[in-house]
Amino acid sequence: AAPLGSPVLAAENGVVSYASDEIAGWGRMILIRHADGFTTGYAHLDSILAAVGDQVTRGQVIGRVGQTGYVDTPQLHFELRSGRRALDPSRHLVKGEEMEVASR
């Protein structure tokens, strides 16, 4: 869970490949393709602040935490993928960065 309207930041430089609410259950969502072949996903957004084709930089605000899709509290669903395979994002963070983890 996260406070409604909190800024959502791009995890790394990349190009927005999807920014919409057309996938059932996910609400408003952004997908970013990165040069290393990874894709990051940010779902349940209240607002989308980037468009398909936009070049985004690490730390750039791309959206706001929301309560869209199949959720009952404001939250951000973050995913890191390589192709169709979901990866554990904690294994790909830059050493020394802090991370707040929430689980169900």
What are these regions (language model features)?
Residues 1-104:
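Catalytic cores of peptidoglycan-degrading enzymes
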